[in-house]
Amino acid sequence: MLLAVLLLLPLPSSWFAHGHPLYTRLPPSALQVLSAQGTQALQAAQRSAQWAINRVAMEIQHRSHECRGSGRPRPQALLQDPPEPGPCGERRPSTANVTRAHGRIVGGSAAPPGAWPWLVRLQLGGQPLCGGVLVAASWVLTAAHCFVGAPNELLWTVTLAEGSRGEQAEEVPVNRILPHPKFDPRTFHNDLALVQLWTPVSPGGSARPVCLPQEPQEPPAGTACAIAGWGALFEDGPEAEAVREARVPLLSTDTCRRALGPGLRPSTMLCAGYLAGGVDSCQGDSGGPLTCSEPGPRPREVLFGVTSWGDGCGEPGKPGVYTRVAVFKDWLQEQMSASSSREPSCRELLAWDPPQELQADAARLCAFYARLCPGSQGACARLAHQQCLQRRRRCELRSLAHTLLGLLRNAQELLGPRPGLRRLAPALALPAPALRESPLHPARELRLHSGSRAAGTRFPKRRPEPRGEANGCPGLEPLRQKLAALQGAHAWILQVPSEHLAMNFHEVLADLGSKTLTGLFRAWVRAGLGGRHVAFSGLVGLEPATLARSLPRLLVQALQAFRVAALAEGEPEGPWMDVGQGPGLERKGHHPLNPQVPPARQP
């Protein structure tokens, strides 16, 4: 082990100096890798900060819209029977390919704007992951596997269909996620989930729902049905920039069994496509629609399948697999029916303003917690109110925890594919908490192929803060204060010009006499960002595997140090600021490893 350290790092010529433990610096090549990863972490931090601000700005926009419409904001759960946005299943005609098997979505053809008014896009922290289908004014149907590892509704938004004239699509927060209770992520059995929108779709807007089947069976085999989505153009390829569409024939159960083997569960799955290959859904299309036309004076589209999984994309003999919607009709109707027996969502509780909320509204919101209360009505109401407050506090912590985990995950994800890091640490592993929470699984899951990947990251453009008086709109002013607080807290990263958004590690000085049981050494770190310099203590590995393991924490410490330095920028600290991390913080100006040996600076 000592030999590996000597080979990796140039050590001083003597082991001891004046009785003090020996120090060693990471070589310039390692500092370059650290700097590159630090810059990527800064970019991820800036995007995460912008997303947090966008989320609150979006809440303000929707709160203002609700106040203008009804004079008072109401959580979505208190809205009863919102009007449906027009007749279901009606769409503009298009030229989707019906007979030839050369198209893909994976290929297909570009759909004209507004051709699929029920097609929506689900985004996690601004990153598009799955498709979905609007089935009612407040409900979207999608695949349950989209939410494996990411069940927090506060992190999701839904982008509605754009208009036929190319109007900008509306982005709506998610209020509730209801995966089917019997969904099995190993077999994709019952791969279905309902998503409740925070605000219902406007009746006059471009989005309208698809029709749900009235009978528990699908059209006969051979029926040409439509698929649409933004998914990959080929397996492991880039996602489509615009909606693409194609038509695929329904296949018989026997044909599907022969093609797909025991992985197919006919009770809840159907398959569609050409056995010759070529036309199929792909990664990113998960949760999207498989619709078939219902003949009549006014033809309409009926949703018979939700994109679930496949063996590759458009490969010969491997049709796509869809969750059968018809067999879940009763469950869908039950979940979409307004009911006070459902526990309030985190978004409803976070929008609730206990000091200002009307008593009747609070009672309706918290009624779930009074269901099994054996006491008097007054005592049960007080108990329900207290439980509402307790869950609200848990939701606040949950939101904060997911935001912090997301920041750490973004920094970690940027470490793996870098050539310099592969040279130093070929086996970088995510910490267990981040791994368990990671939502970046393949969308339109390729169960039989391990090389699939999710679509690229995209973040929503910053929305302007809606203007208007808060009078008569309770809860709007606290949201504006929260927005101002977020803007202030993240100003340190948002105000850094893009040309200066680069982290430079100047020195990492490790104490060879401080090795821990995990193989890490205590180190003194100096780094710079846009003319601002910080110094802090941390733990670093000197071998490839331990160095890789210590990088995520080191980068998070650097981000925290730059934030603290920015907040204290007006204090007379000089060009360097000591921001010790973790236990045993040292006084400013003192070397954390040896008070008598100041850290040498590189030229």
Curated annotation (Swiss-Prot):
Q: Where does the source fall among the domains of life?
A: Eukaryota
A GO BP annotation: camera-type eye development
Glycan-modified residues? N97
Q: Name one GO molecular function term.
A: serine-type endopeptidase activity
In its keyword annotation, does this UniProt entry include Phosphoprotein?
no
What does the UniProt keyword field contain? Answer: Disease variant, Disulfide bond, Glycoprotein, Hydrolase, Microphthalmia, Protease, Serine protease, Signal
Q: Which residues form the signal peptide?
A: 1-19
Is Hydrolase a UniProt keyword of this protein?
yes
Q: Name one Pfam family in it.
A: Trypsin
One GO CC term of this entry? endoplasmic reticulum
Q: Which SUPFAM superfamilies match?
A: Trypsin-like serine proteases
- UniProt domain Peptidase S1: residue ranges: 105-337
Residues of the region (Disordered) are 64-96, 442-474, 573-603
Q: Report the EC code(s) recorded for this entry.
A: 3.4.21.-
Q: Which residues form the active site?
A: H145, D191, S286
Task: Describe the disease involvement stated in the record for this chain.
Answer: Microphthalmia, isolated, 6: A developmental ocular disorder characterized by small malformed eyes. Clinical features are extreme hyperopia due to short axial length with essentially normal anterior segment, steep corneal curvatures, shallow anterior chamber, thick lenses, and thickened scleral wall. Palpebral fissures appear narrow because of relatively deep-set eyes, visual acuity is mildly to moderately reduced, and anisometropic or strabismic amblyopia is common. The fundus of the eye shows crowded optical disks, tortuous vessels, and an abnormal foveal avascular zone.
Say which family it is in.
Belongs to the peptidase S1 family.
User: So what does this one do?
Assistant: Serine protease required during eye development.
Put simply, this protein is called: Serine protease 56
Organism equals Homo sapiens
Top-level taxonomy:
Eukaryota, Metazoa, Chordata, Craniata, Vertebrata
What is the primary gene name for this protein?
A: PRSS56
